[in-house]
Design a protein with these regions (language model features):
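A short beta-strand element within beta-rich, extracytoplasmic domains
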Residues: 84-96
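Trp- and acidic/polar-enriched beta-sheet ligand-binding modules for extracellular glycan
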Residues: 2-75, 96-154
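Extracellular and analogous surface-interaction loops
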Residues: 75-87
C-alpha cells in the first residue's frame, strides 16, 4: 500500500526521527523485552531466528510487556533529529507476528530547549496526529498526516 498526500508519496521523504539524523528516544514507560532505541534504527527491520539475549528473542523493534498489571497504554517519546512538518507515519511491525500492538496512536509537540524527558512525557498539550487506528502484525502500516505544523517530538 502506498499512501499519497497531495500526490506525494510521503514514504520517499526523509525520516525525521531516524538516529543518523540525530533522532533520539528520550523516554518510554516500558522496554522489558526490547529497547526503545530500536524505534529509530535506519533501514528495514531485521530479524535472525534463534538469536537470544538476556531479554529473550532479539527483535529489531520496541517490545513491552503490554500486560503489566496496571492500567494505561505503552508510550515512548521521540525527539526528532530535525524539527519539521510530518507528512506521514509508518508503524513498522515487521517480524512481530503475535506480539504487536493491535492499535496505535501518535501525538506531537513543538517545544523549545531540552526540558527533562519526564516533564515532556507528562505534558498534557500533545496534539494528535494519528488517532487510535488498527495495525497489522509483520507489516509496514503507513498513515498519511494532514498537518502543516512544525514538530520537535512525537
Amino acid at each position: 500500500m502506498t499512501a499519497h498526500l497531495g500526490g506525494e508519496d510521503f514514504t520517499l521523504l526523509p525520516d525525521l526521527a531516524v538516529r543518523p539524523l540525530g533522532g533520539s528516544v528520550i523516554w518510554a514507560n516500558d522496554e522489558f523485552f526490547a529497547e526503545k532505541e530500536n524505534l529509530i534504527n535506519p533501514g528495514p527491520a531485521e530479524y535472525q531466528p534463534s538469536t537470544f539475549g538476556h531479554k529473550g528473542q532479539v527483535y529489531d523493534g520496541w517490545e513491552t510487556r503490554r500486560h503489566r498489571g496496571r492500567p494505561g497504554d505503552d508510550s515512548a517519546v521521540v525527539r526528532l533529529g530535525v524539527p519539521g512538518v510530518i507528512r506521514g507515519i509508518v508503524v513498522d511491525t515487521a517480524w512481530f507476528k503475535g506480539n504487536y500492538p493491535p492499535e496505535v496512536s501518535v501525538s506531537a509537540l513543538a517545544i523549545a530547549g531540552y526540558p527533562p524527558a519526564g516533564e515532556i512525557a507528562a505534558r498534557t498539550d500533545w496534539v494528535p496526529l494519528l488517532d487510535l487506528v488498527k495495525v497489522g502484525g509483520d507489516a509496514r502500516n503507513p498513515f498519511p498526516v494532514d498537518d502543516e505544523n512544525r514538530w520537535t517530538h512525537v
